[in-house]
Structures are given as C-alpha cells and as structure tokens.
Design a protein with these regions (language model features):
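Structural motif
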Residues: 14-15, 106
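C-terminal capping/extension of enzyme domains
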Residues: 3-14, 35-36, 43, 79-96, ...
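Short N-terminal binding/cap micro-motifs at the start of the first secondary-structure element
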Residues: 13, 23-28
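Short amphipathic alpha-helices and their capping/turn segments at secondary-structure boundaries
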Residues: 4-10, 53-62, 98
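N-terminal nucleotide-binding beta1-loop-alpha1 segment
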Residues: 17-20
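Short, surface-exposed acidic-centric catalytic microdomains
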Residues: 26-87
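Short glycine-/acidic-enriched loop or helix-start segments at secondary-structure transitions
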Residues: 26-29, 117-120, 149-150
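Internal catalytic-core helix/loop-beta-alpha segment
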Residues: 64-123
Length: 168
C-alpha cells in the first residue's frame, strides 16, 4: 500500500517529528498537520523551533530548519482508533531503520499514543531512556484538536530547550 504522506527526511536533520498517522484532513491536503485546529505549526513557532509560522502546505520548508517529518503508520489515515489497528512490527522497524539511516539528534513522537505504540507500553511525556543509535527520543503531547484536554505546551518548550542546548 502507498504511503498516505511521503516522509520528509534527509541527512543532517536535527529533529524528526513522528505522528501516529496522517489525519483525514492532512491526507486530503497532502500536507502534515493540516487540520485548522491542530496546534503543531503554532507550537513550532512559539518554541522557536521555526523562526516563522509555517502553514501546512509549507511543510517541506522544515528541512531548512533541519526538521523532518514522518508517521508511525504510513499506510492509513484518520483518527488513532482507525489507524492503530493497522500498526505492524514492520512499521516500527521502518521507523527505527529510517532513524538509523538519517541519524537525527532527536526523534520526537508528537503524541503519547505514538510513543507508547512504538515502545509497546505505557510511557510518560519527556525524554526517554532508550536511544536509536545516538538519537535521543522524546514523547510530546499531541497537538491535535481532539487532544485539547491533555495539551501541555510546557513539554514542547522543554524539548525545544534541549534541542537548543544540544546545538549550543
């Protein structure tokens, strides 16, 4: 099956942000985090991970800020309850292999669900003890409007601080 959204990956990335799967709005727009209620683009700008507020159709511009994008489930679109049953060991391996190949400094899951599904169990927000090669792994709160009840922007700010400290 074809990927709903193509990975935005290349060498020399500082960060790879990984969602669970493309939402239906993102799949239709062929752009990551495209739903108007999604806070993804605003939090990237608010935390100064991007110096400008990008729009979803500008997602390829993230490469100039050394940020890449992918999803845990590449072959499905929709809410987690629709896409997660499609998650396979091959999806986890594909992500690990991509991280090993491109070697970003950080892999950050953009939802607790994505991180927990990758690791196969309960996890807290923040930096994880495991690494993929030398890549540090974080679990961040979901930016989806459907997850407003668990929105914690301070964790995104902590992550951005760690990214800047790693560069500094």
């Amino acid at each position: 099956m074809t990927d709903v959204l193509r990975d935005l990956l290349q060498d020399s990335l500082q960060i790879v942000l990984c969602g669970t799967a493309a939402g239906t709005t993102s799949a239709a727009a062929r752009a990551y985090y495209a739903h108007r209620q999604n806070k993804f683009w605003r939090i990237l700008h608010e935390t100064n991970l991007t110096p400008e507020l990008l729009q979803p159709h500008q997602y390829r511009n993230l490469l100039q800020y050394r940020i890449g994008l992918t999803d845990l489930v590449k072959a499905g679109a929709g809410m987690d309850r629709a896409t997660l049953p499609k998650l396979t060991a091959a999806d986890r391996l594909r992500l690990s292999d991509s991280i090993m190949a491109f070697r970003p400094q950080f892999l950050a899951f953009t939802s607790k669900t994505a991180g927990q599904k990758f690791f196969g169990g309960k996890r807290d927000y923040g930096e994880q003890v495991e690494l993929i090669g030398d890549t540090r792994i974080w679990i961040l709160p979901s930016t989806s409007g459907a997850a407003n009840g668990s929105w914690r922007p301070e964790i995104w700010h902590q992550f951005a601080d760690k990214v800047r400290a790693a560069v500094g």
